[in-house]
Regions:
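Class I S-adenosyl-L-methionine
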Residues: 64-71, 83-303
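Conserved proline-anchored active-site loop of SAM-dependent methyltransferases
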Residues: 3-13, 17, 59, 68-86, ...
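Conserved acidic E/D residue at the C-terminus of a beta-strand in Rossmann-like folds
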Residues: 28-32, 117-118
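Short beta-strand element of Class I
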Residues: 24-25
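Conserved short alpha-helix immediately C-terminal to the canonical SAM/SAH-binding motif I
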Residues: 32-37, 98
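S-adenosyl-L-methionine
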Residues: 36-66
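Conserved acidic residues
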Residues: 31, 53-61, 178-182
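C-terminal target-recognition/interaction regions appended to catalytic cores
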Residues: 257-393
Length: 393
């Protein structure tokens, strides 16, 4: 299954989709440092990446017609700053909104499916009309906004076409869902909107993959069986943080189901085997695992606990990652995650390297889609697509 990816960043989404079985024919990204990082991994011969073609370019200048008919999937994460909870919430007034370019790529390549990722701020009530507008454009990509149209006028045109039930031309069946990466084995609480569409003439029936991990299973492992502490050669804490009612609820959730889920992964699961970066002995065996001084707790930014999923890894403002990119150690002290630790929490493989400075690498990692989350969605999509090929074959 051939694919192209827009706004590829440092390659998190691309890696996950490649692991699911998609063959990327082109990755388009404007940011020079992100492109250079992917290219370094290509040069190092990283499996599955070595054949990628990465183009540092403004997607607004890309002509996709050469991919029409040969691409089964278009994927990408249109820049999220217009919708970010940490941004100024400009959305349709923000020139950084690249969803129109995602729609154009779909229109020109006519893929069997697409996968787009964005921040949960996209679902803010203040953006609800514009989000519906995005979905309508993806459903009917050939209904193009004319130069003198406002987005509201274009939306009215799309609504009329949609409600008329026209089945001619290129159209997609589109669904979206807010997913927590922790529910798919990522050691991090990270909520992202995933939009998936299948070409209407494919007649594919699909839904988002079920969660594979749960908070209840983690609590059960800690406070019912104690398995979590045994796995980490730790003594079970004497203080029970759950009430009797909460503990009963956890038991029911785990014991009274036919399909028990795996437990959420924690920071300790992800980085517990790495040497202390402040101790240079043994650190050299791990690339990108250098200590960074200066971490401190301040209001609203207290760092991530070792025995919980990490807080959301963030790109940071003005090149300075926030308290979310710190870890609270067992002695109560805090320090910044190393680049390698952050990469692990985003489920990048250890041999996928980040060659820029700490600040730049943390920015790239913070902007990435967790590899495991991308793979979970990609696995589900490609399974349905292969089933269609088998049925039609």
């Amino acid at each position: 299954m051939n694919s192209i990816e827009l706004f590829s960043g440092t390659g998190g989404l691309a890696l996950g989709l490649q692991q699911a079985g998609f063959d990327h024919k082109a990755l388009f990204e404007w940011d020079k440092a992100s492109c250079e990082n992917i290219k370094e991994n290509i040069a190092n011969g990283y499996p599955g990446v070595r054949d990628w073609k990465v183009y540092q370019t403004d997607v607004r200048t890309v002509n996709y017609n050469g991919y029409t008919g040969s691409i089964q999937l278009v994927a990408g994460g249109p820049p999220c700053q217009p919708f970010s909870l940490g941004g100024k919430h400009q959305a349709y007034n923000d020139k950084r909104d690249m969803f129109p370019e995602a729609v154009r790529a779909v229109r020109e390549t006519q893929p069997e499916a697409f996968i787009f990722e964005n921040v949960k701020g996209l679902l803010r009530k203040s953006f609800s009309s514009y989000f519906n507008y995005i979905l309508l454009q993806l459903q009917h990509p050939e209904i193009v906004k004319k130069e003198n149209m406002t987005w509201e006028e274009h939306m009215s045109l799309l609504e009329k076409h949609h409600t008329a039930g026209h089945d001619d031309g290129l159209s997609y069946n589109v669904v979206f869902r807010l997913l927590n990466a922790a529910d798919y084995g990522v050691p991090q609480s990270r909520h992202r909107v995933i939009i998936v569409g299948f070409r209407s003439d494919s007649n594919i029936s699909w839904s988002f993959p079920n969660a594979t991990h749960s908070q209840e299973s983690l609590l059960y492992s800690k406070w019912v069986t104690g398995d979590y502490w045994q796995e980490h050669n730790m003594k079970k804490p004497s203080e029970m943080p759950l009430s009797t009612a909460q503990l009963r609820s956890v038991r029911r959730a785990v014991e009274e189901t036919d399909t028990p889920l795996q437990r959420w992964q924690t920071v300790r699961d992800a980085i517990g085997d790495l040497p202390n970066p402040a101790d240079e002995h043994g650190v050299g065996a791990y690339y990108n695992h250098e200590f960074r001084d200066g971490a401190r707790i301040y209001a609203g930014h207290s760092g991530s606990k070792m025995d919980e999923p990490s807080k959301t890894i963030k790109a940071g403002a003005h090149g300075v990652p926030g308290g979310e990119n710190m870890v609270v150690l067992d002695d109560g002290s805090v320090r910044y995650y190393t680049v390698r630790e952050s990469a692990r929490i985003q489920t990048f493989p250890d041999d996928y390297i980040f060659s820029a400075s700490w600040t730049e690498s943390m920015r790239q990692i913070g902007n990435a889609v967790p590899v495991k989350l991308a793979k979970a969605v990609g696995d589900s999509v490609i399974t349905q697509m292969k089933g269609l090929v088998k049925h039609n074959g």
